[in-house]
């Protein structure tokens, strides 16, 4: 199974990008041993439209164009579930074991995700009740994806 992250906005060079890449590399190394084919990242430019509804719509169209067929969609959204790491790992492991070709995680732009994308999602995930900048969300997501691999592998990184 491939893990895909589609993010509106680009991380500039700096500590957030370096940390995200470190978790991505760690996942790729460990994930291959667990039946994962890597972590793909697609960065999309933020819409330049004047109003929020148009920005959300344009970004949703760009996101939808990148979602592979037969994949499961996971939206990072403040209205999503506060899911613990072990439960997220178990869900990703189930999808892998069921032969799902890809789990696609989506990080929206400043205005959030379209209602259509949220409805289409198999799972909505929130990293707590706070609103986070997309740079931080990306680092948190990559860490949780790496943590998923460590949990599935029985690696001591995750100590609950």
Curated annotation (Swiss-Prot):
Q: Which GO terms describe its molecular function?
A: rRNA (pseudouridine-N3-)-methyltransferase activity
Where found, per UniProt?
Answer: Cytoplasm
Residues that coordinate or bind S-adenosyl-L-methionine: 76, 108
Predominant cellular place of this UniProt entry's protein: cytoplasm
Keywords assigned by UniProt?
Answer: Cytoplasm, Methyltransferase, rRNA processing, S-adenosyl-L-methionine, Transferase
Disulphide-bridged cysteine pairs:
none
* Enzyme class (EC, first level): transferase
Reactions catalysed, semicolon-separated, are: pseudouridine(1915) in 23S rRNA + S-adenosyl-L-methionine = N(3)-methylpseudouridine(1915) in 23S rRNA + S-adenosyl-L-homocysteine + H(+)
E.C. code: 2.1.1.177
| GO CC, any one term | cytoplasm
Instruction: State the InterPro entries in the record.
Output: Alpha/beta_knot_MTases (IPR029028), RlmH-like (IPR003742), tRNA_m1G_MTases_N (IPR029026)
Family from the record:
Belongs to the RNA methyltransferase RlmH family.
What's the stated role of this polypeptide?
Answer: Specifically methylates the pseudouridine at position 1915 (m3Psi1915) in 23S rRNA.
Q: Which PANTHER family match?
A: METHYLTRANSFERASE, RIBOSOMAL RNA LARGE SUBUNIT METHYLTRANSFERASE H
Q: Which NCBIfam families match?
A: PRK00103.2-3, PRK00103.2-5
The subunit field of the Swiss-Prot or TrEMBL record says: Homodimer.
State what protein this is by name: Ribosomal RNA large subunit methyltransferase H
UniProt organism field: Bradyrhizobium sp. (strain BTAi1 / ATCC BAA-1182)
């Amino acid at each position: 199974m491939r893990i895909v992250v589609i993010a509106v906005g680009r991380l500039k060079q700096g500590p957030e990008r370096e940390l995200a890449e470190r978790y991505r590399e760690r996942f790729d190394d460990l994930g291959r041993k667990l039946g994962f084919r890597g972590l793909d990242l697609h960065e999309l430019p933020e819409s330049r439209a004047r109003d929020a509804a148009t920005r959300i719509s344009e970004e949703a169209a760009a996101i939808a164009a990148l979602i592979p067929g037969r994949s499961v969609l996971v939206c990072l959204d403040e209205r999503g579930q506060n899911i613990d790491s072990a439960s997220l790992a178990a869900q990703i492991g189930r999808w892998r074991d069921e032969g799902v070709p890809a789990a696609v995680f989506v990080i929206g732009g400043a205005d959030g995700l379209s209602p259509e994308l949220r409805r289409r999602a198999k799972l909505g995930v929130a990293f707590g009740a706070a609103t986070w900048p997309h740079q931080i969300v990306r680092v948190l997501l990559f860490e949780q994806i790496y943590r998923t691999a460590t949990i599935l592998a029985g690696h001591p990184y995750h100590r609950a």
